[in-house]
Swiss-Prot record:
Xref: HAMAP family: UPF0122
N-terminal signal peptide: none
Assigned protein family: Belongs to the UPF0122 family.
Organism: Halalkalibacterium halodurans (strain ATCC BAA-125 / DSM 18197 / FERM 7344 / JCM 9153 / C-125)
Its biological purpose: Might take part in the signal recognition particle (SRP) pathway. This is inferred from the conservation of its genetic proximity to ftsY/ffh. May be a regulatory protein.
Protein name as catalogued: UPF0122 protein BH2485
Length: 109
């Protein structure tokens, strides 16, 4: 499983358009720009607790979106199959093996 920061970055990439502008700003500053809660609080003139609560709520929302839409899971599976395809081509796999991998990629959606 991905570490939390990397997972949140992926989820943010996939689902940021579903967030409010404020949620996007807080998440971007916290996860992408590595701001501390205190720095974000100072930037927006709110308490650290308000920033913390907003980020935790947004993380939960991103996890809910992933649970329902599975964009990250599909991305990871697609990446895994593409890696298997590359390895199969390198080892000169049979056309049946290659077709099986292509079909699994095709049925992923």
């Amino acid at each position: 499983m991905l570490d939390k920061t990397l997972r949140m970055n992926y989820l943010f990439d996939f689902y940021q358009s579903l967030l409010t502008e404020k949620q996007r700003k807080y998440m971007s500053l916290y996860y992408l720009d590595d701001f501390s809660l205190g720095e974000i609080a100072e930037e927006f003139d709110v308490s650290r607790q308000a920033v913390y609560d907003n980020i935790k709520r947004t993380e939960a929302m991103l996890e809910e979106y992933e649970e329902k839409l599975s964009l990250l899971a599909k991305f990871e599976k697609r990446s895994e199959i593409l890696q298997q395809l590359k390895e199969a081509v390198d080892k000169q796999a049979t056309s049946e093996e290659l077709m099986a991998l292509l079909e699994s990629l095709d049925t992923l959606e």
